[in-house]
């Protein structure tokens, strides 16, 4: 399994880091078989798995439950788990309780937190307690209401400079990596050059140290729309609907199950069942 040290070496050597979300045993198993470097159990599960309109309703218990399943499916892959909404915007003591629960109960190797400001001290606090932390700047979905929607961040010089400052503070606080979401590629490149920790982009262009996508977006599974930054490498959704539709048709028309899908009794036992055996 790759570790923090391996990811730092990958950045130094210019080897791109691959990260993919996974939320359950089968998706994690497939991600590991595909040799993904790092798995993110994102609170995006609220939208793509649980059907919520945002990530806000996701709880600590949800993250623990799904991360445990991912750990069972990907035992040899580094796993990062999101701390959900309001689980770390509380007292440091309560933040530690939530963080400890996720790490101890789920087996996550690192936690991810969004934003800067007061979150910087949280990164420092968790790091000092021995919990690796991945920072997340740019578009931070948990704060989408404050940001005014799902918009590109850092498009003007002033806000871009603020993101650069925040990125440096995250590194100084002890973050082992930084996710940059929906920021101009020029800004992402500049931040990546100024940090020693890896940057993982999602909608941040090529000049970052790695990329992350949502599992369901990448394979077109259960999604109707995807953001501009997503490339869909396959479409399992069409095949799944086709297969289920065929199943429904065959049951309705009596084509399924066939004899080869059924079990039988010996003839004498069948006779005995119907009273034909003395």
UniProtKB/Swiss-Prot annotation:
Identify the enzyme class: transferase
- MF-aspect GO terms: 3-methyl-2-oxobutanoate hydroxymethyltransferase activity; magnesium ion binding
Asked if Magnesium is a keyword of the record, the answer is: yes
The entry's Mg(2+)-binding residues are 43, 82, 114
Per the Swiss-Prot or TrEMBL record, the active site comprises 181 (proton acceptor)
Q: Which reaction does it catalyse?
A: 3-methyl-2-oxobutanoate + (6R)-5,10-methylene-5,6,7,8-tetrahydrofolate + H2O = 2-dehydropantoate + (6S)-5,6,7,8-tetrahydrofolate
Instruction: Locate the residues binding 3-methyl-2-oxobutanoate.
Output: 43-44, 82, 112
The pathway this protein participates in, as annotated, is: Cofactor biosynthesis; (R)-pantothenate biosynthesis; (R)-pantoate from 3-methyl-2-oxobutanoate: step 1/2
Entry's cofactor comment: Binds 1 Mg(2+) ion per subunit.
Q: Set out the biological process GO terms recorded for this chain's protein.
A: pantothenate biosynthetic process
Where does the protein end up? Cytoplasm
**One Pfam family for this entry, by name?**
Pantoate_transf
User: Family assignment?
Assistant: Belongs to the PanB family.
Subunit record text: Homodecamer; pentamer of dimers.
| Protein name as annotated | 3-methyl-2-oxobutanoate hydroxymethyltransferase
Q: What organism is listed for this UniProt entry?
A: Bacillus mycoides (strain KBAB4) (Bacillus weihenstephanensis)
**Gene (name only):** panB
């Amino acid at each position: 399994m790759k570790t923090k040290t391996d990811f730092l070496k990958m950045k130094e050597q210019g080897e791109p880091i691959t990260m993919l979300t996974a939320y359950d045993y089968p998706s994690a198993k497939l991600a590991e078989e595909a040799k993904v470097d790092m798995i993110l159990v994102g609170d995006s599960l609220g939208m793509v798995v649980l059907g919520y309109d945002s990530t806000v309703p996701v709880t600590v218990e949800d993250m623990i439950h799904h991360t445990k399943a991912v750990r069972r499916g990907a035992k040899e892959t580094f796993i990062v788990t999101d701390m959900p909404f309001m689980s770390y915007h509380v007292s440091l003591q309560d933040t530690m309780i939530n963080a400890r629960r996720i790490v101890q109960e789920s087996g996550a190797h690192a936690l991810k937190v969004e934003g800067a400001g007061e979150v910087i001290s949280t990164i420092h606090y968790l790091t000092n307690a021995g919990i690796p932390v991945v920072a997340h700047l740019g578009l931070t979905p948990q704060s989408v209401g404050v940001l005014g929607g799902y918009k590109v961040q850092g498009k003007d010089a002033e806000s871009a400079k603020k993101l650069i400052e925040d990125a440096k503070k995250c590194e100084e606080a002890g973050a082992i990596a930084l996710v940059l979401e929906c920021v101009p590629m020029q800004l992402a490149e500049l931040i990546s050059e100024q940090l020693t920790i890896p940057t993982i982009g999602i909608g941040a262009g090529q000049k970052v140290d790695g990329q992350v996508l949502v599992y369901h977006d990448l394979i077109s599974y259960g999604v109707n729309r995807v953001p501009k930054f997503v490339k869909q490498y396959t479409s399992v959704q069409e095949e799944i609907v086709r297969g289920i539709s065929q199943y429904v048709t065959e049951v309705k028309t009596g084509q399924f199950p066939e004899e080869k899908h059924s079990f039988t009794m010996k003839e004498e036992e069948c006779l005995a069942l119907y009273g034909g055996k003395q």
